[in-house]
Amino acid sequence: MYLLIPAAGMGKRMGSDRNKLLLTLHGKPLLAWTLLAAMESRAIIWIGIMAQPEDFEEIRAIITPINALKPVQIIQGGETRQKSVYNGLQALPEGAETVLIHDGARCLATPELFDRCAAALATCQGFIAAIPVKDTIKIVDSKGWIEDTPDRSRLWAAQTPQGFQVKLLKECHEQGRKLDWEVTDDAALLEKCGFPVKIVVGEETNLKITTPGDLAIAEYILSQRL
């Protein structure tokens, strides 16, 4: 299984002017925790990291002490997550048939989650890790008035990894570029192209580090694991 990690974003909501994946969590950069879990996964054999050139040196410095037993390639990232994943798909080794895409900011994903997700591609063309929504969700208009309350039993919070057949995902990305679609995850491209996407149950602790509060929660979760 091949793994692509989008890592080209900035940490604006973290109040930082640098790539948030280079920030420290429990003594290591966020990206290091993601890589360590990927290294322990039995299914993953190759890792590609899409990043901006100004971060290449720091990312190499993160990779080196991990003593990676699997090939890790740094790939030029794009202006958006969507464009970064497109670049990553073009850089996959020849013969890659399936791929996992995992946000580097979800640095608490476990090796077991990677392995379960990899296995899911034996039964579908595309899937996302997700967990059932616990809170009641409200649809609100631009002025703050509630318009609707969707049935919570049908709502799931999307996570990563997300996994796909490489050929199909490339075709959907090309269609998205042709029609100028803008999406926030790769599953949305398959949906817009009319392909079904399956749910694989994710992990409650697989949160995305977006704000300083998320970082504090992640510190606590890691302290309980180590």
From Swiss-Prot:
Annotated GO MF terms: 2-C-methyl-D-erythritol 4-phosphate cytidylyltransferase activity
This protein's name: 2-C-methyl-D-erythritol 4-phosphate cytidylyltransferase
Pathway in which the depicted protein is active: Isoprenoid biosynthesis; isopentenyl diphosphate biosynthesis via DXP pathway; isopentenyl diphosphate from 1-deoxy-D-xylulose 5-phosphate: step 2/6
From the UniProt record, report the name of the gene that encodes this protein: ispD
Asked if Nucleotidyltransferase is a keyword of the record, the answer is yes
Reaction(s) this enzyme catalyzes, per UniProt: 2-C-methyl-D-erythritol 4-phosphate + CTP + H(+) = 4-CDP-2-C-methyl-D-erythritol + diphosphate
EC annotation? 2.7.7.60
User: What exactly does this protein do?
Assistant: Catalyzes the formation of 4-diphosphocytidyl-2-C-methyl-D-erythritol from CTP and 2-C-methyl-D-erythritol 4-phosphate (MEP).
What InterPro entries does the record tag this protein with?
Answer: IspD, IspD/TarI, IspD/TarI_cytidylyltransf_bact, ISPD_synthase_CS, Nucleotide-diphossugar_trans
Q: What class of enzyme is it?
A: transferase
For this UniProt record, the keywords arranged alphabetically read as follows: Isoprene biosynthesis, Nucleotidyltransferase, Transferase
